[in-house]
């Protein structure tokens, strides 16, 4: 691959990124005026840099404490949150639920699935808390890491899938008992056909999907077809735009503010709303350096030997036809500048969701 393709779409310069920060500073958390509200909530991972920055100032303060984070989401103009709730006592449950009801905010939880019989008590305690809080859903992941990084062969993938099935079979009676929707994310772990087969095998009313609108692209699934196929199973959504660019071993995939990336967010919104008109979605935008998807390497294909070449061709064609103008590379920045960009990314996304997507 020629280097001039990379040079035609440079990464965001520090000056350009700081200009983006300045443009969005009017509605971040520490602004003096309360921003307008979007229905789009925030996944806790969006604010990981701010959490780290705040803990450096005060090690005892945790932005991700559920009520603290829900108030932060309200303050920046988001419509709710997705975060780990853990196990909360009755007073904390009441405070969280009352605040959410008063402010009309959605709450999603995050939970680890039960590893084995010995882990069921922990899992049920967290699900009971989620039920008492009144969550829309509880998001989970059942396979570790990104498929093309975590595993070396298809056999390893199949072994992890078997463990995932066992964990979800353990979880099913508990989430059914408490009537809590367990939403399994497409986490760059299974291709679309594999994930649909998992849902059909489980056939549980309370096990469905966290539809991540970008992850399936990393496994060469059709960018919009995957969302359409997963949408009927959706209990919640990781709503994201992503910037694409070729590199010598495949393509780069980077979270970017809504409307600034390579995907048609209006089309994605329409697909999801058509299938689930009342679903409340959560922005997932992790401010970090781009991820590498090495789809032109032997190691990548070792875990997906039966995927056809036309899927690769479609994916690379999409990357070439929809290159983002900029990518954000922030790893070398100071923590203070990173948190400013993180705030600005969230602010710009909520503004786009509110003004363009009517969310």
Predicted regions and their residues:
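Acidic-and-aromatic substrate-binding clefts and catalytic sites of carbohydrate-active enzymes
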Residues: 82-93, 113-121, 148, 186-193, ...
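Histidine-acidic metal/acid-base catalytic patches
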Residues: 2, 17-22, 32-41, 46-59, ...
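Catalytic domains of carbohydrate-active enzymes, especially glycoside hydrolases
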Residues: 64-87, 134
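Active-site acidic/histidine proton-transfer and metal-coordination neighborhood
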Residues: 24-32, 88, 102-108, 114-208, ...
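Active-site mouth loops of central-metabolism enzymes
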Residues: 46-64, 111-120, 154, 158-159
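N-terminal secretory signal peptides
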Residues: 1-12
